[in-house]
């Protein structure tokens, strides 16, 4: 094995990388370049080329994008197995991954601090420490480390992206600063730096479009997305995700039929099974924004039927069918169709169980499986007014997630307890559960009910502000798709 140390004249000293092959290292570095363009397909392609040459390549096993859970676990297990054969940097990076997966966020931060202490001239080390802080919502510490990374290497496009992503919505499940602390001008400054570093890459133009979409300037967003699509086409990169983004913009601009054409195009152009499925999930949710529950269920059934033609493995088919049934359950439940909602809830659980049967189940997978079952069962009971049953499930959820170190581990439990107390007529008790983590940037669904509790307790100004943010939230997510129209109705009734 060779441990490659930097011979660069740059002030940015790459972390030492252990591999048996210079060619494998070249493929690995190409993968990271494409990751800077947010091209998961190319990242995966070149990481796997590196692994074809050197199957024991620690960091390639750790970072390769792989959507099949069994294959992904094989890669990560190989990284864990080999961590002591590499440099201390590689060991720390693997330890960070394990800690993050297990929810040991304090340990994750401490490992990252050691990485920075041992490799103070590596911009990547500071990005990794920033990421560890960001997960815990310690945004200022995260930003300080991202900025330090750009001080070391002004061309570290991943660091600029991290800085911009604190202020600008781009991806589902992205962690953003609370709306009151966001600075869109600063975010644009960071994204413009990305564009200057990678003018041929589509991602910067897409993010600029997202800024305009967030502000309700859908026509300006269209221009940015057109530029981004041209970049994708010119470089022969996958465009299905961007076609979905164009569709989102059309949904919020009231051009629903045109949006469906773009969703369909995104599915048909998907180069991977996951590309097709991801666009399909967004298409289901687009109907929920319009309270078209039957339309959402019709599309969900079609996508579920098509999954086997996408090229998924059996375990992925079951996992994805479970996610589709979750959306059907919520569509039925918000339409107050109890029998149908329960059927979809049980189908979701059944598909998840079948997926588990095809996986090597460790403690974390079992924990997450049990937590999801309790959470979704509680959700069902809440939406149909069965509050004692809901509390029983939430107590089960608490017994699972309270053992996780993460400061966000209790968020779903707390928010759902807040919903229970609200519907029981105890607005003050409800607000004691709706903590500061429940904000409109990261939990739009729960924020709607938090606003109802605030309104019931006489805090109308704060409640109205939350309703307004949700009603004008122009991004496609499951939770917000269920409450955006409800927030609009609250504003109209005042």
Which residues does each PLM region occupy?
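Alpha-helical segment of the N-proximal tetratricopeptide repeat
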Residues: 20-49, 53, 91-114, 118-124, ...
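Alpha-solenoid helical repeat scaffolds
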Residues: 28, 59-63, 91-94, 124-128, ...
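Alpha-helical adaptor scaffolds
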Residues: 93, 97-101, 165-169, 402-440
């Amino acid at each position: 094995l060779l441990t490659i140390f930097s011979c660069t004249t740059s002030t940015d000293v790459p972390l030492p990388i252990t591999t048996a092959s210079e060619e494998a290292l070249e493929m690995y570095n190409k993968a990271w370049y494409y990751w800077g363009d947010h091209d998961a397909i190319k990242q995966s392609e070149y990481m796997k080329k590196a692994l074809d040459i050197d199957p024991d390549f620690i960091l390639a096993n750790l970072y390769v994008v792989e959507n099949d859970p069994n294959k992904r676990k094989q890669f990560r297990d190989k990284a864990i197995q080999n961590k002591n054969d590499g440099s201390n940097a590689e060991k720390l990076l693997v330890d960070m991954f394990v800690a993050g997966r297990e929810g040991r966020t304090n340990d994750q931060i401490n490992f990252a601090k050691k990485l920075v202490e041992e490799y103070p001239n590596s911009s990547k080390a500071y990005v990794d420490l920033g990421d560890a802080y960001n997960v815990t919502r310690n945004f200022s510490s995260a930003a300080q480390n991202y900025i330090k990374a750009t001080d070391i290497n002004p061309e570290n496009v991943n660091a600029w992206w991290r800085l911009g992503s604190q202020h600008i919505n781009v991806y589902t499940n992205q962690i953003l600063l609370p709306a009151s602390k966001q600075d869109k001008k600063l975010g644009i400054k960071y994204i413009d730096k990305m564009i200057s570093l990678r003018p041929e890459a589509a991602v910067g133009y897409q993010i600029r479009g997202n800024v305009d979409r967030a502000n309700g300037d859908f026509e300006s967003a269209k221009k940015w997305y057109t530029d981004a699509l041209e970049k994708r086409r010119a470089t022969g990169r996958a465009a299905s995700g961007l076609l979905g983004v164009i569709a989102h913009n059309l949904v919020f601009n009231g051009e629903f039929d045109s949006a469906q054409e773009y969703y369909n195009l995104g599915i048909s152009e998907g180069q991977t099974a996951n590309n097709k499925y991801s666009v399909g999930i967004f298409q289901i949710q687009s109907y929920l924004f319009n309270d078209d529950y039957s339309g959402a269920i019709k599309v969900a059934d079609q996508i579920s039927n098509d999954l086997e033609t996408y090229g998924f493995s059996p375990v992925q088919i079951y996992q994805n069918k479970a996610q589709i049934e979750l959306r059907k359950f919520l569509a039925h439940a918000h339409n107050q169709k109890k029998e149908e909602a329960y059927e979809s809830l049980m189908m979701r659980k059944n598909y998840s169980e079948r997926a588990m049967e095809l996986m090597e189940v460790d403690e974390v997978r079992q924990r997450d499986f049990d937590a999801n079952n309790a959470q979704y069962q509680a959700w069902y009971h809440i939406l149909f007014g069965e509050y004692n049953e809901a509390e029983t499930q939430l107590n089960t959820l608490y017994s699972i997630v309270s053992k996780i170190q993460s400061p966000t581990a209790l968020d779903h439990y707390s928010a759902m307890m807040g919903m229970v107390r609200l519907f029981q007529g105890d607005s003050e008790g409800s607000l004691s559960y709706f903590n500061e983590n429940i904000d409109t940037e990261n939990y739009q669904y729960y924020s709607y009910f938090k606003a109802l509790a605030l309104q019931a307790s006489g805090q109308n100004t704060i409640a109205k502000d939350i309703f307004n943010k949700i009603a004008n939230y122009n991004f496609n997510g499951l939770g917000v798709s269920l409450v955006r129209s409800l927030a609009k109705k609250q504003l109209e009734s005042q």
